[in-house]
Amino acid sequence: MSSLSLTAKAIRRGFLTIAATTVATGSVFSGSVIAEEAQAEKVERIAVTGSRIKRTDMETASPVSVIDASAIIASGATSIDDVLQKMTSSGGAMTNAAVNNGSGGNARVNLRGLGSNRTLVLVNGRRMIASGTGAASSVDLNTIPVSMIQRVEVLKDGASAVYGTDAIAGVVNVILKRDFDGFELNVQTGISGQGDADESSIDFTMGNTFDKGNVVINAQYTKRGDASQADRDFSECPIAEGADGLYCAGSSYSEGGHIWGANGADLSGRGGEYHEFTDADRYNYSASSFLSTPMERLNLSMAGTYDLSDSIMFFSEAMYSKRWSDQQMAPQPIWNSESWEYQPISAGGWMTDDLLPWVEDGELVDYGRRMVESGSRDFSQVVDTIRLVVGVEGEFDNGWTWDASYNKGKNDSVDTLANLHNIGSINDAVQAEEFDPFLQSSWMGDSIAPFVYTEVNAGGSELDIASLSLSGDIVDLPAGTMGFAAGYEFRKESAYYTPDSLTAQGLANDPRVEATSGSFDVNEAYVELAIPLISDIPLLQQVDLSAAIRYFDYSTFGDDTTWKLGLTWRVFDDLMLRGGQSTAFRAPTVSELFGGKSPSFDQIVHPATDQTQAEVTVGGNPLLTPEEADITTLGLVYSPSFVDGLSLTVDYYDIGITNTITSVDSNYIANQCLDANGNKINEGTALCQASNIEIDNTGRISFDNGLQNIGETNTSGFDINLAYTFEGLGLDWKAGLDTSILDTYEEFDQDGNAVDYKGFITGGVGAYAEFKTNFNLTAAGDDWSATYEARYIDGMDSFACKDDPSDCYAPSVDSIVYHDISANYDITETVRLSGGVNNVLDEEPPYYTGNNDSNTDPYTYDVLGRYFFVRASVKF
């Protein structure tokens, strides 16, 4: 079936669903609607995200969506990730408050499901520092104060020619308040329908405009409480599938210990006395795991300008963010790395007799235990992020504008993991007959205390950017004036990760990990042109060409160029066609280049040896080169003159990424780099050069398995946006429909085998619904407004059941619709009350075979259920 047929089918299905359920979508409008409103007020030249050329028309060859502050407030969001992750163009694995296992308290945006490191985040058009824990490689959205946001522009197109690395899936440009006069105070609180996950926020903004400039100061404090998996029916226990259906399962590493004897004994020590192990002895690890994670956050920000002369202005921006976040998981499961010999006292040994008669004297046993005596595993992060921008901008007599700026960012983090146990030391104590593992009291109090430790890791990153830019009109052509922009940037990035000392020495439970430390710098220069080709011809009212090229020279891999071409064709006043072709790239990050090494033993099969394990060292790879992308977009913008306030945009995108940075199967490296006789082959390839493969006289193969440029990802689809503003019943109305249709999403492994994710939900990689749509409707009176919103997510098949759905109890999930309502009322000219309810119908997330966490997918679905929020604002 053709792509167009699939698209038409998906559109029909989505619109029928919306009509049947009165669905609504997010408050996202295309650039055309915003442009019409702006033109009604005044005509000015502005730089739209995706171009550095200032222009009067917001519609360019690339699709840009705009989210304004009112839409953010209406959603009840206290962090911008709450809004961005609900966009239909967002997808994949999006880290948020509902991700307990491995989130590190971070919040990311993931356009097109291509990964947060392929979405560039800007603040006021300038690169934001990568932030979070470790040697972070993407932006933690917690660092951007939502109360300071004026609007967010989302470019859904590649833009490396304009902005450089990372702009493959698109660009999120957060525009902060700059011209603000007066004082504003906001207080907001919210809570779930279950009485948990409470969240409170207080912020103030004050600003003043004076003769030569202005200054704006903002502070925001947010505190979010937790919710437990034990407090929701769908997540109160880990669900397993049996012949008779679903049942509550659990871990065989149980409370009181689990013993497997060499002669078939299977014992549980739950309750303090050993007995035959049954399913009732399995440990419910959901009961002590967070469903939604707690956090505290402080954001301070400032922006100011000062006129140095009639044509030169000094500007500055400063942001500081401090985050305290926590996650909680079940007590640690531990096990013996080598079997223990049972030596009971009754047979002249030194161990308890409690295992008799199930285990014989001298019998080898394996042991596992859930360490409930020590408490849950508590993950905590403290993250400090600073961003400072200073610069000057001006205008020449000919109207050309220029600016010079310095952008400094710094991120530091400390993350801890409490209530861990050093099983290596416990094993040593058992062998020395100093610790009886079968005696329950050995695992309690002072006896176990010497083996309990807290892991403490540190990490951080630093960013320095010096930039110069120039833009203006260069020549009048028959069809209009040619505009240009040019600039130079120098950027240096560094990052580090210092693991806990026990981990670094290989004395902890996890494999030894070396520290990460490194840096790189890059010199970049770019030129951009906006060339009017044709004007004032029937059916060719205006045709414009845009072109951009960027040269970059990295200290790590060398130099190259990236480019972009775009065309806009205004057929007549109502209709504009647009398209673009570009290349984009993502340079390897510090952690990918210089990530600390860690040894492991991997299973391999190779004709040069009888050994089945290879000594493999994983980590970064300093020989990495950039990921490369080819991007095509085609679209139309239609604003019919016979329907005032109506605007439609339809855009097609196709993104092909090659040279993707990914891990490689160890068998693949061994077979690519050694022949059947153990001789090195393919030594000229990047893969084998980086592997440093060797085989010794015993047949032991050893090599480095660092990250490689060996993968490929392709995705394509359609974005449809319909916006309508009108008057009726004495009210002002605004309606919006935002739809994304996924046509393809494929990833290719090192052998060129394609893995198709379209229409599938995975166990942590992401969810790739074929059809997603958001709708919203706002009615506004003189002193009030009310908004209805809804999100539709198409049904998906479980990726775990792809080969044989009949083997799965829940091989798919049904489509789901979330309904939200909000309203505000102006009590006086200075006081406003607002509030709302998200997930009004209290929809539960779906269960599916092969789920990620909480028996569902917290990256995609709302796990809290119905949520209430209220807000009071004072402004004067």
List where the protein language model places each region.
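C-terminal beta-signal and terminal closure region of outer-membrane beta-barrel proteins
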Residues: 415-418, 422-425, 582, 599, ...
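N-terminal Sec signal peptide and the immediately downstream disordered periplasmic leader
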Residues: 1-77, 82-86, 203, 207, ...
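Surface-exposed, low-complexity loop segments enriched in small/polar and acidic residues
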Residues: 227-240, 264-295, 301, 310-522, ...
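C-terminal beta-signal and adjacent terminal beta-strands/loops
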Residues: 656-658, 743, 791-802, 824-876
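Short loop/turn motifs that connect adjacent beta-strands in outer-membrane beta-barrel proteins
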Residues: 39-41, 179-182, 195, 211-212, ...
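N-terminal periplasmic accessory domains that precede
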Residues: 80-83, 87, 107-110, 140-142, ...
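Extracytoplasmic beta-strand/coil segments of soluble accessory domains associated
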Residues: 81-127
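Short acidic/polar hinge/loop motifs at secondary-structure boundaries
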Residues: 127-156
